[in-house]
Design a protein with these regions (language model features):
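Donor-nucleotide binding loops and adjacent catalytic segments primarily
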Residues: 41, 46, 50, 175-182, ...
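Glycine-rich phosphate-binding loop signature in dinucleotide/nucleotide-binding domains
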Residues: 28, 86-92, 186-188
């Protein structure tokens, strides 16, 4: 089986795509899988590391605000449908899978024009515009949350799958675990909470956590607020009299 996976931009779109690809490979080792993305996003790092090839198209996210820049993005995205068609004609996939976001609109629209079956995976509770537009002709729309079903047309063929992930478990001895905790400068005798808002971070999570790390707690926090938020949080903590590199019960990682 030959499969094209459309995934671009953030880890929230790309990692589920990679997890789907890995599952297909585990079930059908002879399958051929390529990704379609842009030349700008995390896909250019994550997809090759996972062992898959990637092709690029010039798709962009389009905002609702009417500006010249937005018009340029729209024109490029419309043109990217033709670029996607060229890739699909060359690769001749049996199935196209979109993981949401602007890339799904371009690639699934191209698949639709070429009469190639496509499915969509939507990880969010609130489906994006691309998912809403392309869901009506999709073979299936797989949902991360059952609530998302009620935001789509009732005629859409949905199935709740949850969000696929690449699970990797480490079997550490107590001594190894304590050593890793020590490397982080934390106390192995206190509970440790991991706070992670995805590759871009999550503003609501960061807002809730930033004051917690200042307090003296009977637990410890490992916090990954996202690269784009790191400097802002560093400044906020500095204003509160805290050095981000030297908070007793917290380790904050970009």
């Amino acid at each position: 089986m030959k499969v094209v996976i459309a995934a671009a931009g953030t880890g929230g779109h790309i990692n589920p795509g990679i997890a789907i690809a890995n599952k297909i490979k585990s079930e059908q080792p002879d399958s051929e899988i390529i990704f379609i993305g842009t030349d700008r996003g995390l896909e250019n790092d994550l997809v090759p590391k996972a062992g898959y090839g990637i092709k690029h198209i010039g798709a962009y996210g389009v905002y609702r605000k009417p500006t010249i820049e937005n018009l340029k993005r729209l024109i490029k995205t419309i043109h990217s449908i033709s670029e996607a068609k060229t890739i699909l004609k060359e690769f001749k996939p049996d199935l196209v899978i979109g993981t949401g976001g602007y890339i799904t609109l371009s690639v699934c629209r191209a698949a639709q024009k070429l009469q190639i079956p496509y499915i969509i995976h939507e990880s969010n509770v609130l489906p994006g515009i691309a998912t809403k537009l392309m869901s009506k002709k999709a073979k299936y729309v797989m949902l991360g949350f059952k609530e998302a079903k009620y935001k789509l047309n009732p005629k859409v063929n949905t199935v709740v799958t949850g969000t696929p992930s690449n699970t990797k478990c480490l079997n550490l001895t107590t001594e190894q675990k304590d050593e890793k905790i020590k490397e982080l400068g934390l106390n192995s005798k206190l509970p440790i909470i991991l706070v992670f808002g995805g590759s871009q971070g999550a503003k609501s999570i960061n807002t809730a956590v930033e004051d917690l790390v200042i307090k003296e707690n009977n637990y410890q926090i490992i916090w990954a607020p996202g690269k784009k938020n790191f400097e802002e949080i560093k400044e906020y903590l500095f204003e509160k009299g805290k050095d981000i590199e030297n908070i007793k019960n917290a380790r904050i990682l970009p």
